[in-house]
Amino acid sequence: MINRELIAPESIVIIGGSNNTQKPGGKIIRNLLEGKFPGKLYAVNPKETEVQGIPCFPDITSLPNTELAILAVPAAACPSIVEELASTRNTKAFIIISAGFGEETH
C-alpha cells in the first residue's frame, strides 16, 4: 500500500544531504528546491549546519518529526537509520538511494 507520506509528504529529510550537487544527497536537495517542494525540507549531515539554504542537523536525534526520509548513505547504515527514524521521528515513508544491497551469493 502506498501512503500519502510517500507521494505527497509535508516534510522531507535527506539523510546525507550535501552542498556538493555532484553527490547524490546534494542532487536530491537541488532537485527538490528547483521543483519548489512546498513543504519543510531538512538535511542530516554532521559536518554542516545548513545545506543549500535548508536547515541541517548533525544527527537524527536533533531532527524534528518528518514524514518522508530520503537516504543517500551507504547501504550498511540504512537499516538502523530507518529503524531510528520510524521509532523516534514518526517517519512513515522512505526512499533509499544507495549502492551495496546486492544479493548474497553462495
Residue ranges of each PLM-predicted region?
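Catalytic-core regions of core metabolic enzymes
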Residues: 1-106
